[in-house]
Protein backbone atom coordinates (compact mmCIF):
# COMPACT_ATOMS: atom_id res chain seq x y z
CA UNK A 1 0.00 0.00 0.00
CA UNK A 2 1.07 3.57 -0.68
CA UNK A 3 0.69 5.05 2.81
CA UNK A 4 0.77 8.58 1.43
CA UNK A 5 -2.17 7.80 -0.86
CA UNK A 6 -3.87 6.25 2.17
CA UNK A 7 -3.46 9.41 4.24
CA UNK A 8 -4.35 11.61 1.29
CA UNK A 9 -7.73 9.86 1.30
CA UNK A 10 -8.01 10.14 5.09
CA UNK A 11 -7.25 13.87 5.06
CA UNK A 12 -9.80 14.53 2.31
CA UNK A 13 -12.38 12.51 4.28
CA UNK A 14 -11.56 14.64 7.32
CA UNK A 15 -12.21 17.81 5.32
CA UNK A 16 -15.67 16.46 4.51
CA UNK A 17 -16.27 15.48 8.14
CA UNK A 18 -15.59 19.02 9.40
CA UNK A 19 -17.89 20.33 6.65
CA UNK A 20 -15.25 22.55 5.08
CA UNK A 21 -16.80 24.57 2.25
CA UNK A 22 -15.68 27.46 0.03
CA UNK A 23 -16.93 30.87 1.07
CA UNK A 24 -18.39 31.46 -2.40
CA UNK A 25 -20.24 28.15 -2.46
CA UNK A 26 -19.70 25.14 -4.70
CA UNK A 27 -17.13 22.40 -4.13
CA UNK A 28 -13.61 22.71 -2.79
CA UNK A 29 -10.75 22.14 -5.23
CA UNK A 30 -8.70 19.47 -3.48
CA UNK A 31 -6.31 18.84 -6.39
CA UNK A 32 -3.49 20.94 -4.93
CA UNK A 33 -3.37 19.13 -1.61
CA UNK A 34 -0.03 17.43 -1.11
CA UNK A 35 0.68 14.55 1.26
CA UNK A 36 4.33 13.57 1.56
CA UNK A 37 7.15 12.84 3.99
CA UNK A 38 8.33 15.94 5.90
CA UNK A 39 11.70 17.27 4.75
CA UNK A 40 12.91 16.83 8.33
CA UNK A 41 11.93 13.42 9.70
CA UNK A 42 11.99 14.82 13.25
CA UNK A 43 8.83 16.76 12.37
CA UNK A 44 6.77 13.60 11.87
CA UNK A 45 5.87 10.87 9.40
CA UNK A 46 3.31 12.62 7.18
CA UNK A 47 3.09 16.28 6.15
CA UNK A 48 0.29 18.06 4.32
CA UNK A 49 -0.22 21.55 2.95
CA UNK A 50 -4.02 21.19 2.98
CA UNK A 51 -4.68 24.25 5.16
CA UNK A 52 -2.36 26.47 3.13
CA UNK A 53 -3.88 25.66 -0.26
CA UNK A 54 -7.48 25.83 0.98
CA UNK A 55 -7.33 28.87 3.28
CA UNK A 56 -8.14 31.45 0.60
CA UNK A 57 -11.09 29.47 -0.74
CA UNK A 58 -12.66 29.01 2.70
CA UNK A 59 -11.74 32.52 3.88
CA UNK A 60 -9.77 31.48 6.94
CA UNK A 61 -6.24 32.15 8.20
CA UNK A 62 -3.97 29.21 7.20
CA UNK A 63 -2.77 28.49 10.73
CA UNK A 64 -6.27 28.70 12.16
CA UNK A 65 -7.56 26.37 9.47
CA UNK A 66 -4.61 24.04 10.08
CA UNK A 67 -5.51 23.90 13.77
CA UNK A 68 -9.08 23.00 12.90
CA UNK A 69 -7.99 20.22 10.55
CA UNK A 70 -5.33 18.99 13.00
CA UNK A 71 -7.88 18.69 15.79
CA UNK A 72 -10.03 16.44 13.60
CA UNK A 73 -7.07 14.34 12.45
CA UNK A 74 -6.00 13.75 16.05
CA UNK A 75 -9.01 11.45 16.49
CA UNK A 76 -7.64 9.02 13.86
CA UNK A 77 -6.78 5.76 15.65
CA UNK A 78 -3.43 5.50 13.84
CA UNK A 79 -2.26 9.04 14.65
CA UNK A 80 -0.11 9.59 17.71
CA UNK A 81 0.44 13.36 17.46
CA UNK A 82 -0.55 16.21 15.14
CA UNK A 83 1.37 19.49 15.01
CA UNK A 84 0.92 22.71 13.08
CA UNK A 85 4.20 24.18 11.83
CA UNK A 86 5.27 27.38 10.08
CA UNK A 87 2.60 29.16 8.06
CA UNK A 88 0.19 26.23 8.26
CA UNK A 89 1.82 22.87 7.53
CA UNK A 90 0.28 19.93 9.36
CA UNK A 91 2.66 17.20 10.54
CA UNK A 92 1.42 13.81 11.71
CA UNK A 93 3.32 11.28 13.80
CA UNK A 94 1.89 7.78 13.45
CA UNK A 95 1.68 5.12 16.13
CA UNK A 96 4.08 2.17 16.20
CA UNK A 97 1.08 -0.15 15.78
CA UNK A 98 0.38 1.44 12.40
CA UNK A 99 3.93 0.79 11.20
CA UNK A 100 3.84 -2.77 12.54
CA UNK A 101 0.63 -3.40 10.61
CA UNK A 102 2.10 -1.86 7.44
CA UNK A 103 5.23 -3.99 7.77
CA UNK A 104 3.03 -7.07 7.96
CA UNK A 105 1.33 -6.05 4.70
CA UNK A 106 4.73 -5.45 3.06
CA UNK A 107 5.97 -8.87 4.15
CA UNK A 108 2.82 -10.50 2.81
CA UNK A 109 3.24 -8.84 -0.61
CA UNK A 110 6.84 -10.01 -0.90
CA UNK A 111 8.63 -8.91 -4.05
CA UNK A 112 5.35 -7.50 -5.39
CA UNK A 113 5.41 -4.81 -2.71
CA UNK A 114 5.51 -1.48 -4.52
CA UNK A 115 3.94 -2.85 -7.70
CA UNK A 116 1.30 -0.41 -8.92
CA UNK A 117 -1.74 -0.22 -11.19
CA UNK A 118 -0.94 3.40 -11.96
CA UNK A 119 -0.50 2.74 -15.68
CA UNK A 120 -3.36 0.30 -16.17
CA UNK A 121 -4.88 0.85 -19.61
CA UNK A 122 -1.92 2.85 -20.95
CA UNK A 123 0.16 1.40 -23.78
CA UNK A 124 3.64 2.94 -23.92
CA UNK A 125 6.38 2.64 -26.52
CA UNK A 126 9.89 3.34 -25.23
CA UNK A 127 12.41 3.77 -28.04
CA UNK A 128 16.05 3.87 -26.99
CA UNK A 129 19.57 3.19 -28.25
CA UNK A 130 18.65 3.11 -32.00
CA UNK A 131 22.36 3.38 -32.84
CA UNK A 132 23.25 3.38 -36.53
CA UNK A 133 24.15 -0.19 -37.61
CA UNK A 134 27.58 0.90 -38.81
CA UNK A 135 29.75 -0.56 -36.05
CA UNK A 136 29.99 -1.65 -32.43
CA UNK A 137 28.33 0.44 -29.75
CA UNK A 138 30.62 2.99 -28.14
CA UNK A 139 30.48 4.20 -24.55
CA UNK A 140 28.39 7.20 -25.61
CA UNK A 141 25.46 4.85 -26.29
CA UNK A 142 25.68 3.33 -22.83
CA UNK A 143 23.76 5.91 -20.83
CA UNK A 144 20.75 6.08 -23.13
CA UNK A 145 20.63 2.28 -23.25
CA UNK A 146 20.44 2.03 -19.46
CA UNK A 147 18.08 4.98 -18.94
CA UNK A 148 15.66 3.67 -21.57
CA UNK A 149 15.80 0.08 -20.37
CA UNK A 150 15.31 0.90 -16.69
CA UNK A 151 12.55 3.40 -17.45
CA UNK A 152 10.71 0.71 -19.40
CA UNK A 153 11.15 -1.77 -16.53
CA UNK A 154 9.93 0.84 -14.07
CA UNK A 155 6.84 1.64 -16.12
CA UNK A 156 6.01 -2.07 -16.38
CA UNK A 157 6.28 -2.39 -12.59
CA UNK A 158 3.93 0.59 -12.30
CA UNK A 159 1.30 -1.17 -14.38
CA UNK A 160 1.89 0.22 -17.87
CA UNK A 161 1.77 -1.97 -20.98
CA UNK A 162 5.28 -1.30 -22.30
CA UNK A 163 7.09 -2.18 -25.50
CA UNK A 164 10.85 -1.63 -25.74
CA UNK A 165 11.79 -0.62 -29.29
CA UNK A 166 14.95 -0.12 -31.32
CA UNK A 167 14.76 1.85 -34.58
CA UNK A 168 17.32 0.52 -37.07
CA UNK A 169 18.59 3.40 -39.22
CA UNK A 170 19.31 1.16 -42.19
CA UNK A 171 18.06 3.25 -45.12
CA UNK A 172 20.35 6.28 -45.14
CA UNK A 173 23.45 7.24 -47.09
CA UNK A 174 25.65 5.94 -44.26
CA UNK A 175 24.52 2.40 -45.11
CA UNK A 176 25.68 2.82 -48.70
CA UNK A 177 29.07 3.94 -47.37
CA UNK A 178 29.11 0.94 -45.03
CA UNK A 179 28.43 -1.47 -47.89
CA UNK A 180 31.28 0.02 -49.95
CA UNK A 181 33.57 -0.26 -46.91
CA UNK A 182 32.74 -3.95 -46.51
CA UNK A 183 33.15 -4.54 -50.25
CA UNK A 184 36.71 -3.30 -49.82
CA UNK A 185 37.28 -5.73 -46.93
CA UNK A 186 35.80 -8.51 -49.08
CA UNK A 187 38.36 -7.80 -51.80
CA UNK A 188 41.06 -7.78 -49.14
CA UNK A 189 39.88 -11.19 -47.93
CA UNK A 190 40.27 -12.48 -51.50
CA UNK A 191 43.95 -11.51 -51.38
CA UNK A 192 43.87 -8.04 -52.93
CA UNK A 193 46.17 -5.40 -51.43
CA UNK A 194 43.72 -2.59 -50.72
CA UNK A 195 46.26 -0.20 -49.18
CA UNK A 196 44.92 2.55 -46.94
CA UNK A 197 41.17 2.79 -46.47
CA UNK A 198 40.02 5.74 -48.60
CA UNK A 199 38.73 8.80 -46.79
CA UNK A 200 34.98 8.70 -46.31
CA UNK A 201 34.75 4.94 -45.80
CA UNK A 202 34.56 3.15 -42.45
CA UNK A 203 38.12 2.11 -41.51
CA UNK A 204 37.33 -0.08 -38.47
CA UNK A 205 38.86 -3.54 -38.19
CA UNK A 206 35.47 -4.83 -37.04
CA UNK A 207 34.52 -4.99 -40.74
CA UNK A 208 37.33 -7.43 -41.56
CA UNK A 209 35.41 -10.54 -40.36
CA UNK A 210 32.38 -9.45 -42.41
CA UNK A 211 34.51 -9.31 -45.55
CA UNK A 212 36.05 -12.67 -44.70
CA UNK A 213 32.63 -14.30 -44.28
CA UNK A 214 31.54 -12.94 -47.66
CA UNK A 215 34.70 -14.29 -49.29
CA UNK A 216 34.14 -17.66 -47.64
CA UNK A 217 30.52 -17.83 -48.84
CA UNK A 218 30.76 -16.33 -52.32
CA UNK A 219 34.37 -16.66 -53.37
CA UNK A 220 34.91 -14.12 -56.17
CA UNK A 221 31.28 -14.23 -57.38
CA UNK A 222 30.45 -10.78 -56.02
CA UNK A 223 33.10 -9.25 -58.27
CA UNK A 224 31.41 -10.81 -61.27
CA UNK A 225 27.98 -9.34 -60.46
CA UNK A 226 26.76 -5.91 -61.54
CA UNK A 227 28.01 -3.48 -58.89
CA UNK A 228 24.53 -2.39 -57.76
CA UNK A 229 23.44 -6.01 -57.30
CA UNK A 230 26.59 -6.91 -55.38
CA UNK A 231 26.33 -3.85 -53.13
CA UNK A 232 22.67 -4.62 -52.36
CA UNK A 233 23.62 -8.12 -51.24
CA UNK A 234 26.60 -6.85 -49.24
CA UNK A 235 24.38 -4.22 -47.62
CA UNK A 236 21.91 -6.84 -46.38
CA UNK A 237 24.61 -9.15 -45.02
CA UNK A 238 26.46 -6.26 -43.38
CA UNK A 239 23.39 -4.86 -41.63
CA UNK A 240 22.67 -8.35 -40.27
CA UNK A 241 26.27 -8.65 -39.04
CA UNK A 242 26.28 -5.19 -37.45
CA UNK A 243 22.95 -5.76 -35.72
CA UNK A 244 24.19 -9.11 -34.40
CA UNK A 245 27.20 -7.26 -32.97
CA UNK A 246 24.99 -4.56 -31.45
CA UNK A 247 22.60 -7.10 -29.95
CA UNK A 248 25.55 -8.92 -28.38
CA UNK A 249 26.83 -5.65 -26.91
CA UNK A 250 23.38 -4.86 -25.51
CA UNK A 251 23.05 -8.37 -24.13
CA UNK A 252 26.31 -7.89 -22.24
CA UNK A 253 24.67 -4.86 -20.62
CA UNK A 254 21.45 -6.83 -19.96
CA UNK A 255 19.50 -4.62 -22.37
CA UNK A 256 16.84 -6.41 -24.39
CA UNK A 257 14.33 -4.92 -26.82
CA UNK A 258 10.95 -6.33 -27.75
CA UNK A 259 10.88 -4.84 -31.26
CA UNK A 260 13.60 -4.00 -33.79
CA UNK A 261 11.97 -1.75 -36.39
CA UNK A 262 13.80 -1.37 -39.69
CA UNK A 263 13.73 2.05 -41.33
CA UNK A 264 13.77 0.24 -44.67
CA UNK A 265 10.27 -1.03 -43.86
CA UNK A 266 9.06 2.53 -44.43
CA UNK A 267 10.57 2.57 -47.93
CA UNK A 268 9.18 -0.67 -49.34
CA UNK A 269 6.61 -0.58 -52.14
CA UNK A 270 7.74 2.87 -53.32
CA UNK A 271 7.81 4.23 -49.75
CA UNK A 272 4.12 3.53 -49.27
CA UNK A 273 4.25 4.10 -45.50
CA UNK A 274 5.78 7.56 -45.96
CA UNK A 275 3.33 8.50 -48.71
CA UNK A 276 0.39 7.39 -46.57
CA UNK A 277 1.64 9.45 -43.63
CA UNK A 278 2.00 12.56 -45.80
CA UNK A 279 -1.43 11.98 -47.33
CA UNK A 280 -2.99 11.81 -43.86
CA UNK A 281 -1.34 15.08 -42.86
CA UNK A 282 -2.46 16.63 -46.15
CA UNK A 283 -6.09 15.68 -45.49
CA UNK A 284 -5.81 17.37 -42.09
CA UNK A 285 -4.48 20.55 -43.68
CA UNK A 286 -0.95 20.24 -42.29
CA UNK A 287 0.86 20.06 -45.66
CA UNK A 288 1.43 22.67 -48.37
CA UNK A 289 3.70 23.49 -51.30
CA UNK A 290 6.05 26.37 -50.71
CA UNK A 291 9.55 27.75 -50.24
CA UNK A 292 11.35 28.18 -46.96
CA UNK A 293 13.47 31.28 -46.35
CA UNK A 294 17.16 30.45 -45.96
CA UNK A 295 17.95 29.93 -42.26
CA UNK A 296 20.70 31.89 -40.57
CA UNK A 297 24.10 30.29 -40.39
CA UNK A 298 24.98 26.99 -42.06
CA UNK A 299 22.26 25.71 -44.37
CA UNK A 300 20.72 22.34 -43.41
CA UNK A 301 20.82 19.48 -45.90
CA UNK A 302 17.07 19.56 -46.56
CA UNK A 303 16.93 23.27 -47.46
CA UNK A 304 16.74 24.30 -51.11
CA UNK A 305 15.71 27.46 -52.91
CA UNK A 306 12.86 25.70 -54.71
CA UNK A 307 9.27 24.81 -54.00
CA UNK A 308 9.00 21.80 -51.71
CA UNK A 309 6.29 19.83 -49.93
CA UNK A 310 6.26 21.28 -46.41
CA UNK A 311 4.75 20.34 -43.05
CA UNK A 312 3.01 23.22 -41.23
CA UNK A 313 4.85 22.35 -38.05
CA UNK A 314 4.80 25.95 -36.78
CA UNK A 315 1.04 25.57 -36.32
CA UNK A 316 1.63 22.73 -33.86
CA UNK A 317 4.48 24.14 -31.81
CA UNK A 318 7.63 23.96 -33.95
CA UNK A 319 9.96 26.89 -34.73
CA UNK A 320 9.88 26.50 -38.52
CA UNK A 321 7.94 24.49 -41.09
CA UNK A 322 9.72 21.29 -42.12
CA UNK A 323 10.32 19.85 -45.61
CA UNK A 324 8.73 16.46 -46.26
CA UNK A 325 9.57 16.10 -49.94
CA UNK A 326 12.23 17.86 -51.98
CA UNK A 327 11.58 19.42 -55.37
CA UNK A 328 12.92 16.29 -57.10
CA UNK A 329 10.36 14.08 -55.34
CA UNK A 330 12.81 12.57 -52.84
CA UNK A 331 11.56 12.26 -49.28
CA UNK A 332 13.46 13.97 -46.49
CA UNK A 333 14.70 12.10 -43.43
CA UNK A 334 12.05 13.97 -41.45
CA UNK A 335 9.32 12.42 -43.62
CA UNK A 336 10.51 9.04 -42.36
CA UNK A 337 10.18 10.30 -38.78
CA UNK A 338 6.57 11.22 -39.49
CA UNK A 339 5.81 7.81 -40.99
CA UNK A 340 7.52 6.02 -38.10
CA UNK A 341 5.52 7.94 -35.51
CA UNK A 342 2.32 7.18 -37.41
CA UNK A 343 3.24 3.50 -37.45
CA UNK A 344 3.62 3.55 -33.66
CA UNK A 345 0.34 5.38 -33.21
CA UNK A 346 -1.44 2.94 -35.52
CA UNK A 347 -0.09 0.08 -33.40
CA UNK A 348 -2.15 1.42 -30.51
CA UNK A 349 0.41 3.29 -28.42
CA UNK A 350 -1.06 6.29 -26.64
CA UNK A 351 2.29 7.35 -25.23
CA UNK A 352 5.67 7.39 -26.96
CA UNK A 353 8.95 7.99 -25.18
CA UNK A 354 12.15 8.71 -27.10
CA UNK A 355 15.47 8.43 -25.23
CA UNK A 356 18.04 10.37 -27.24
CA UNK A 357 21.50 11.84 -26.86
CA UNK A 358 21.79 15.50 -25.89
CA UNK A 359 22.97 16.28 -29.43
CA UNK A 360 19.41 15.54 -30.61
CA UNK A 361 17.93 18.45 -28.67
CA UNK A 362 16.95 20.14 -31.93
CA UNK A 363 14.61 17.24 -32.73
CA UNK A 364 12.37 17.70 -29.71
CA UNK A 365 10.03 20.41 -31.03
CA UNK A 366 9.64 18.79 -34.44
CA UNK A 367 8.81 15.42 -32.88
CA UNK A 368 6.28 17.05 -30.57
CA UNK A 369 4.75 18.78 -33.60
CA UNK A 370 4.51 15.44 -35.42
CA UNK A 371 2.79 13.86 -32.41
CA UNK A 372 0.18 16.62 -32.23
CA UNK A 373 -0.53 16.54 -35.96
CA UNK A 374 -0.62 12.77 -36.47
CA UNK A 375 -2.70 11.98 -33.37
CA UNK A 376 -4.79 15.18 -33.29
CA UNK A 377 -3.29 15.84 -29.88
CA UNK A 378 -4.40 12.48 -28.45
CA UNK A 379 -0.97 10.86 -28.09
CA UNK A 380 1.53 11.90 -25.47
CA UNK A 381 5.16 12.24 -26.55
CA UNK A 382 8.13 12.64 -24.24
CA UNK A 383 11.77 13.06 -25.26
CA UNK A 384 14.43 12.32 -22.66
CA UNK A 385 17.83 13.74 -23.55
CA UNK A 386 20.88 12.05 -22.06
CA UNK A 387 23.92 14.20 -21.42
CA UNK A 388 27.48 13.05 -22.02
CA UNK A 389 29.39 10.56 -19.92
CA UNK A 390 32.98 11.47 -19.09
CA UNK A 391 35.37 8.63 -18.27
CA UNK A 392 37.92 8.85 -15.45
CA UNK A 393 40.41 6.53 -13.80
CA UNK A 394 41.40 7.46 -10.24
CA UNK A 395 40.17 10.99 -10.90
CA UNK A 396 42.16 11.43 -14.11
CA UNK A 397 40.30 11.88 -17.44
CA UNK A 398 40.39 8.91 -19.80
CA UNK A 399 40.69 9.47 -23.54
CA UNK A 400 37.47 8.42 -25.26
CA UNK A 401 39.43 6.90 -28.15
CA UNK A 402 42.23 4.35 -28.34
CA UNK A 403 45.56 4.74 -30.10
CA UNK A 404 44.06 3.00 -33.13
CA UNK A 405 41.64 5.91 -33.41
CA UNK A 406 38.64 3.76 -32.52
CA UNK A 407 36.30 4.85 -29.73
CA UNK A 408 36.15 3.03 -26.41
CA UNK A 409 33.25 0.65 -26.86
CA UNK A 410 30.40 -0.20 -24.56
CA UNK A 411 31.81 -3.72 -24.38
CA UNK A 412 35.21 -2.40 -23.27
CA UNK A 413 33.58 -0.73 -20.26
CA UNK A 414 31.34 -3.67 -19.34
CA UNK A 415 34.20 -6.16 -19.66
CA UNK A 416 36.39 -4.09 -17.34
CA UNK A 417 34.01 -3.24 -14.49
CA UNK A 418 31.00 -5.53 -14.93
CA UNK A 419 27.41 -5.09 -16.01
CA UNK A 420 25.90 -4.09 -12.66
CA UNK A 421 28.23 -1.17 -11.87
CA UNK A 422 27.67 0.24 -15.36
CA UNK A 423 23.87 0.01 -15.15
CA UNK A 424 23.65 1.41 -11.63
CA UNK A 425 26.10 4.26 -12.15
CA UNK A 426 24.50 5.36 -15.43
CA UNK A 427 21.45 6.14 -13.27
CA UNK A 428 23.29 7.93 -10.50
CA UNK A 429 22.67 11.33 -12.04
CA UNK A 430 19.52 12.63 -13.67
CA UNK A 431 19.68 11.94 -17.41
CA UNK A 432 19.91 15.64 -18.36
CA UNK A 433 22.99 16.23 -16.15
CA UNK A 434 26.54 15.30 -17.24
CA UNK A 435 27.86 12.14 -15.58
CA UNK A 436 31.40 11.27 -14.51
CA UNK A 437 32.22 7.55 -14.61
CA UNK A 438 35.39 6.57 -12.74
CA UNK A 439 36.62 3.04 -13.45
CA UNK A 440 38.35 2.88 -10.06
CA UNK A 441 35.44 4.27 -8.02
CA UNK A 442 32.83 1.89 -9.43
CA UNK A 443 34.87 -1.17 -8.45
CA UNK A 444 36.01 -0.14 -4.97
CA UNK A 445 34.37 -1.75 -1.95
CA UNK A 446 33.24 1.28 0.02
CA UNK A 447 30.26 3.43 0.89
CA UNK A 448 31.41 5.83 -1.83
CA UNK A 449 30.59 3.20 -4.46
CA UNK A 450 26.77 3.16 -4.59
CA UNK A 451 26.36 -0.13 -6.43
CA UNK A 452 28.66 -1.97 -4.01
CA UNK A 453 26.91 -0.36 -1.03
CA UNK A 454 23.45 -1.43 -2.21
CA UNK A 455 24.47 -4.95 -3.23
CA UNK A 456 26.39 -5.36 0.04
CA UNK A 457 23.15 -4.58 1.89
CA UNK A 458 21.43 -7.37 -0.06
CA UNK A 459 24.24 -9.79 0.80
CA UNK A 460 24.08 -8.77 4.46
CA UNK A 461 20.36 -9.53 4.57
CA UNK A 462 21.09 -13.08 3.43
CA UNK A 463 23.93 -13.30 5.93
CA UNK A 464 21.33 -12.64 8.65
CA UNK A 465 19.16 -15.44 7.24
CA UNK A 466 22.12 -17.85 7.33
CA UNK A 467 22.83 -16.85 10.93
CA UNK A 468 19.19 -17.55 11.77
CA UNK A 469 19.59 -21.05 10.34
CA UNK A 470 22.79 -21.65 12.31
CA UNK A 471 21.79 -20.07 15.64
CA UNK A 472 18.02 -20.63 15.74
CA UNK A 473 17.61 -23.60 13.43
CA UNK A 474 15.35 -21.54 11.14
CA UNK A 475 16.36 -22.73 7.68
CA UNK A 476 12.99 -21.87 6.14
CA UNK A 477 11.57 -18.58 7.37
CA UNK A 478 7.77 -18.49 7.57
CA UNK A 479 6.42 -15.06 6.66
CA UNK A 480 3.23 -15.52 8.66
CA UNK A 481 5.23 -16.60 11.68
CA UNK A 482 7.53 -13.59 11.44
CA UNK A 483 4.65 -11.13 11.05
CA UNK A 484 2.93 -12.56 14.14
CA UNK A 485 5.61 -10.98 16.31
CA UNK A 486 5.87 -7.51 14.76
CA UNK A 487 4.44 -6.01 17.96
CA UNK A 488 7.92 -6.65 19.37
CA UNK A 489 9.39 -4.00 17.03
CA UNK A 490 9.21 -0.88 19.18
CA UNK A 491 12.68 0.64 19.01
CA UNK A 492 12.66 3.97 17.17
CA UNK A 493 15.50 2.83 14.88
CA UNK A 494 13.43 -0.16 13.77
CA UNK A 495 10.36 1.99 13.14
CA UNK A 496 12.55 4.42 11.16
CA UNK A 497 13.62 1.56 8.88
CA UNK A 498 9.96 0.58 8.38
CA UNK A 499 9.21 4.20 7.42
CA UNK A 500 11.93 4.12 4.78
CA UNK A 501 10.51 0.87 3.37
CA UNK A 502 7.03 2.40 3.29
CA UNK A 503 8.27 5.09 0.89
CA UNK A 504 8.87 2.52 -1.87
CA UNK A 505 5.38 2.46 -3.48
CA UNK A 506 5.26 6.26 -3.60
CA UNK A 507 8.78 6.32 -5.04
CA UNK A 508 7.81 3.88 -7.81
CA UNK A 509 4.76 5.90 -8.83
CA UNK A 510 6.56 9.26 -8.68
CA UNK A 511 9.51 7.95 -10.72
CA UNK A 512 7.08 6.52 -13.29
CA UNK A 513 4.95 9.68 -13.52
CA UNK A 514 7.97 11.95 -13.92
CA UNK A 515 9.90 9.37 -15.99
CA UNK A 516 12.95 9.71 -13.76
CA UNK A 517 14.50 6.27 -13.17
CA UNK A 518 17.43 7.82 -11.31
CA UNK A 519 15.10 8.27 -8.33
CA UNK A 520 15.13 4.51 -7.83
CA UNK A 521 18.93 4.36 -7.63
CA UNK A 522 18.94 7.17 -5.05
CA UNK A 523 16.23 5.46 -2.98
CA UNK A 524 18.04 2.11 -2.95
CA UNK A 525 21.19 3.82 -1.73
CA UNK A 526 19.23 5.51 1.07
CA UNK A 527 17.56 2.23 2.04
CA UNK A 528 20.91 0.43 2.04
CA UNK A 529 22.35 3.18 4.22
CA UNK A 530 19.46 2.83 6.70
CA UNK A 531 19.94 -0.94 6.82
CA UNK A 532 23.72 -0.74 7.27
CA UNK A 533 23.15 1.77 10.09
CA UNK A 534 20.79 -0.66 11.82
CA UNK A 535 23.36 -3.43 11.40
CA UNK A 536 26.00 -1.21 13.00
CA UNK A 537 23.68 -0.38 15.91
CA UNK A 538 23.44 -4.09 16.62
CA UNK A 539 27.23 -4.32 16.59
CA UNK A 540 27.45 -1.51 19.16
CA UNK A 541 24.40 -2.53 21.23
CA UNK A 542 23.70 -6.28 21.61
CA UNK A 543 20.04 -5.53 22.41
CA UNK A 544 19.56 -4.30 18.82
CA UNK A 545 21.08 -7.30 17.06
CA UNK A 546 18.84 -8.88 14.46
CA UNK A 547 19.17 -12.27 16.15
CA UNK A 548 18.81 -12.68 19.91
CA UNK A 549 19.12 -16.35 20.74
CA UNK A 550 17.42 -15.87 24.12
CA UNK A 551 14.40 -14.10 22.57
CA UNK A 552 13.19 -16.10 19.54
CA UNK A 553 9.99 -14.05 19.12
CA UNK A 554 11.91 -10.78 18.84
CA UNK A 555 14.38 -12.49 16.51
CA UNK A 556 11.52 -13.61 14.26
CA UNK A 557 10.12 -10.08 14.17
CA UNK A 558 13.49 -8.61 13.24
CA UNK A 559 14.03 -11.33 10.64
CA UNK A 560 10.71 -10.26 9.13
CA UNK A 561 11.99 -6.69 8.94
CA UNK A 562 15.20 -7.88 7.27
CA UNK A 563 13.14 -9.97 4.85
CA UNK A 564 11.20 -6.90 3.69
CA UNK A 565 14.47 -4.97 3.27
CA UNK A 566 15.75 -7.86 1.14
CA UNK A 567 12.50 -7.94 -0.87
CA UNK A 568 12.67 -4.23 -1.67
CA UNK A 569 16.38 -4.30 -2.53
CA UNK A 570 15.76 -7.28 -4.83
CA UNK A 571 12.75 -5.59 -6.41
CA UNK A 572 14.60 -2.33 -7.03
CA UNK A 573 17.77 -3.97 -8.32
CA UNK A 574 15.71 -6.15 -10.64
CA UNK A 575 14.06 -3.06 -12.13
CA UNK A 576 17.52 -1.54 -12.58
CA UNK A 577 18.63 -4.78 -14.25
CA UNK A 578 21.28 -5.64 -11.66
CA UNK A 579 21.72 -8.65 -9.40
CA UNK A 580 20.70 -8.78 -5.74
CA UNK A 581 23.52 -10.99 -4.44
CA UNK A 582 23.12 -13.37 -1.51
CA UNK A 583 26.82 -13.00 -0.71
CA UNK A 584 29.69 -10.83 -1.89
CA UNK A 585 32.55 -12.49 -3.70
Curated annotation (Swiss-Prot):
A cellular component term, taken from the record's GO annotations: cytoplasm
E.C. number(s) listed in UniProt: 6.1.1.19
Motif extent ('HIGH' region): 131-141
Catalytic activity as recorded in UniProt: tRNA(Arg) + L-arginine + ATP = L-arginyl-tRNA(Arg) + AMP + diphosphate
Keywords tagged on the record: Aminoacyl-tRNA synthetase, ATP-binding, Cytoplasm, Ligase, Nucleotide-binding, Protein biosynthesis
Major enzyme class: ligase
An example molecular function term from Gene Ontology annotations: arginine-tRNA ligase activity
Cellular localisation: Cytoplasm
SMART domains linked: Arg_tRNA_synt_N, DALR_1
One Gene Ontology biological process: arginyl-tRNA aminoacylation
Keyword Protease: no
Main location: cytoplasm
Quaternary structure, from the entry: Monomer.
NCBIfam families: argS
Similarity remark: Belongs to the class-I aminoacyl-tRNA synthetase family.
Protein name as annotated: Arginine--tRNA ligase
Amino acid sequence: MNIFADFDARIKKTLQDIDLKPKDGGDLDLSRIGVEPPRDSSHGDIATNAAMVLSKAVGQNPRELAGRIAEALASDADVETVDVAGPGFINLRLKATYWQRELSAMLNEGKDFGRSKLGAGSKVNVEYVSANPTGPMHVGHCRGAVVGDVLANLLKFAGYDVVKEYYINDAGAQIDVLARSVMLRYREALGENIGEIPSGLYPGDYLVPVGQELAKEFGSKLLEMPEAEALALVKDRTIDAMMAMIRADLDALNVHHDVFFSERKLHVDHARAIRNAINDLTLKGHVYKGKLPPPKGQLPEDWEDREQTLFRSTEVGDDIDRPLMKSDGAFTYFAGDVAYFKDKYDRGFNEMIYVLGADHGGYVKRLEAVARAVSDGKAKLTVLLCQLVKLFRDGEPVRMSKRSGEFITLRDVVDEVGRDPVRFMMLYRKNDAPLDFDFAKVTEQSKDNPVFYVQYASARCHSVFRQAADQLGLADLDRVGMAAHFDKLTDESEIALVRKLAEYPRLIEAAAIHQEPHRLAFYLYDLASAFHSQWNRGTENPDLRFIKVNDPDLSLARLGLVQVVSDVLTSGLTIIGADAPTEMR
